[in-house]
Each structure stands twice: as structure tokens, then as C-alpha cells.
Amino acid sequence: MRRLLAAVLTLLPCAVHAETVTFGLDWKAEAEYGGYYQAVATGIYAKHGLDVTVKQGGPQVNHTQLLLAGRLDYNISSNSFLALNFVKENIPFRTVASMFQKDPSVLIAHAGQGNDTFAALKGKPIMISSDTRVGWWNFLKARFGYTDAQIRPYTFNLAPFLSDKTAIQQGFLGSEPFSIKETAHEEPVVMLVADAGFTGYASLIATSDKRIRENPDQVKRFIEASIEGWYSYLNGDPAPGNALIKKENPEMTDALMAYGRESLKKHGILDSGDAAKDGIGAMAAARWAAFYASVRDQGIYPAGLDATKAYTLQFVNQKAGMGK
């Protein structure tokens, strides 16, 4: 009994002193966030002294605003444009890790219509969201000569695409292609924007400069635990994370989550490029500089913007979680 009591008392300080962290996603719970749910479900965050609540996003949720208002401690910034927006607007928040080395955004078309390359889509109507219009769409305009006259609204409803064989729309690698296969029983043409040369990071974790300055240890533990969660989800048994995802978002099926996870693995979304040697979450100053130069030359951002304020390398490139 004394030994049991001693063991319990030894564990209590960890539980009592676990720091509460609220983390916002940029979309609904799905395999593209599997590493975070895996870190919660398997106790990885707890092992790092953190009590993490993951809040899913959605079309009516603006977690960036909640982060800036202090209602979230960390959130997912979808792409590098959002990080540069912080700098442009002189907002004291920045990226502390980039979980996706490749942006999983895709353009999707029907097979057999001649719409199987990015170049072939020039001048043709394409359904995209308002966020995409101010994001990687600008890369496609500069790279392939697309124009805004091609834009048609995308409302995250597949019906317009499925009813028109000439339709082209945006999507995410691990979701819309699967739904199209399941619904229409056809294999769509899927073109990964990153494969066309888009170098922006994706699924970045952002937090405040104040937190980085005043509690760098928490930031370090949160990033390292998240990275460990991702290695566990990709290379181990994803069942614990998937169970939490389904609890949060009952629309997720086992088949869809398996497809999403396999898409991440097959295309090296998390562990390619610099992450192959420096670990998931890796970032490089040279890549940030090149990305800024490209979007500056497209007129999206002004000359003289200090892109180094968009990120910090303090918590990444340390091979955290590798081999686990």
C-alpha cells in the first residue's frame, strides 16, 4: 500500500502542473490533423507536461482571429501567405513550425477531358475559394498565365463538379479525390500544386511573439510533442488518433481517414525535403526568402518586407521525434 501511495504521489505533480494549451485547427477534424489527435490520445502531450485541447475549425470558424484575440494559444496557419500577412500588418505573431513541407492543395478535373496538366487549364473556368484566390492562385497565374476571369466560386460542395464533366475545382489531396471516387465511381485527375513548383509551406503552427519570449519552454514542448505525435500517426498505429477524429467529426469514415493518411505518406507531405534530415516541422531561411521574393515579384507583398519576422527556427530542425 505504501509503495502504491508513493507511486501515486510521484505522478501527481505532473498531472497538477500540466500546462493547459488550446490549439486551433484550420478545418474540421480529419487525417490531415492526425498527429495532433494522436499526441492527445496516446499521452504524448501529457508526457511533455501539457494538457492540450484541440479545437477543430470549419467554414464558419476563423481561428486566426481567435488566436489574435488570445482565445487560442496556438493555431494552424494554412499557408505561408498568412505568416507574411502578420509581418505586413505588423501583427506580433509568427510561425514556429511547418508541419507540411508540401502544400496538399490540388486542382481536380474529370478524366478524358484534356484537363490533365496545369498548362492545359489556362483560360478554363476553375472553381476556387476566396482564400485560395489570395493564396496559391497567384502562383498559378504567374507560372501558367491563368487570369482571374477563370475563377468560379467554390462552396465546398461537390455537386457542381459531379454534374459537369468539364468542371475543374480546387481540393485537398486526402479528401475531395476520395469523395469523388466514392460518389461518382470515377478516378479524377488530381494535380498537386506543390508539384508544379509552388514552394510555400503549409499547415504551419503559429503563436504570439509574447509567448515565444515569455514561455519558450512551453513552445518547445508543444512543438516537439506535436512532431512526435505525427511520427506516431504516420509510422505507427493510427487507431488512437483516428478514434478521436471520429469523435470530433462523425462524418469521418475509416476508409476516408485511411485514404487521407496514405496520401500524406505517399506524397511526402510531412517528411520530404528538409524534414527528411531535420525532422518533421523543419523550415529553412533560404526557402522562406525565396518564397517571399516570388510573391513580392508577383506584386502580392511590397518590397522591403522583412520576411524573417514571419517565422523563427528556434524550435525546429532539431530532429525531434525521429526514429520514434
Language-model segment annotations:
Residues 1-4:
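Positively charged n-region of N-terminal signal peptides that target proteins for export
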Residues 13-15:
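N-terminal signal peptide c-region/cleavage motif recognized by signal peptidases
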Residues 19, 85-96, 148, 163-166, ...:
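Ligand-binding "clamshell"
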Residues 20-154, 158-163, 167-174, 199:
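Short, glycine-/small- and polar/acidic-enriched structural segments
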Residues 40-43, 48-49, 71, 76-79, ...:
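Sec/Tat-exported extracytoplasmic proteins
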Residues 99-108, 185-212, 223, 261, ...:
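Periplasmic-binding protein-like
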Residues 213-298:
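Secondary-structure end/capping motifs
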Residues 285-324:
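Conserved C-terminal helix/tail region of periplasmic/extracytoplasmic solute-binding proteins
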